[in-house]
A protein has these predicted regions:
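Conserved metal-binding segment of the jelly-roll/cupin
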Residues: 107-131
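Non-catalytic, conserved peripheral segments adjacent to functional cores
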Residues: 1-110, 131, 138-195
Length: 195
């Protein structure tokens, strides 16, 4: 696999190595050994995933921007196995030089790209195809009492979701998240969330 660093430290794009022939293709979607060998040195620590999730959504669905509060913080490794999504990570670590900045990447069933979102980031995606199946690995279990979010529709984040407003489809919960300017982040750049 090939690791691509982004403009925000720790946020990574992972390009798997595909083997193609007349029958189709094959690739390892995840190898703990290779992730440890190639990603951990860039991050400066290991990431041990413990839960896999999958969602299916239709065009215009926007999920996010979600995170889990300490001590239940999560890193995520995400990919789109059917359709197309725009996936976004937003830095919400107080004191970070990239606080409020984001990285956006299009994940598709054809490009097979994976996106690593570290702890201390809010995560969300928008479905750009008729339907999309989205998978993600987490390094902490889901804890509903630690749920948090910032508004996926916050214009100050400068995210072009590629979805016309009239087609945006959000859950009731996601419509109630705060704007970044009103948000008191539980994350701090000086606190190591991986210890």
């Amino acid at each position: 696999m090939n690791i691509v660093k982004t403009d925000i430290e720790g946020v990574l794009i992972i390009e798997p190595r595909l083997f193609r022939d007349a029958r189709g293709y094959f690739f390892e979607s995840f190898s703990e050994r290779e992730f440890e060998e190639k990603v951990a040195p860039i991050l400066g620590h290991s990431v041990l995933f413990c839960q896999d999730n999958e969602s299916m959504s239709s065009y215009g669905v926007m999920r996010g921007l979600h995170f889990q509060r300490p001590p239940y913080t999560q890193s995520k490794l995400v990919r789109c196995v059917k359709g197309r999504v725009l996936d976004v990570a937003v830095d919400i670590r107080k004191g970070s030089p990239t606080y409020g900045k984001h990285v956006a990447v299009e994940l598709t069933e054809d490009n097979h790209i994976q996106f690593f979102i570290p702890k201390g980031f809010a995560h969300g995606f928008a479905v750009l195809s008729e339907t999309a199946v989205f998978q993600y690995k987490c390094d902490n279990f889901y804890h509903p009492e630690a749920d948090g979010g910032i508004s996926i529709l916050d214009d100050t984040l400068g995210i072009d979701w590629k979805i016309p407003t009239e087609h945006a489809n959000l859950s009731e919960k996601d419509t109630k998240h705060e704007m970044l300017k009103d948000f008191d982040s539980p994350f701090d750049i000086n606190v190591n969330l991986y210890e």
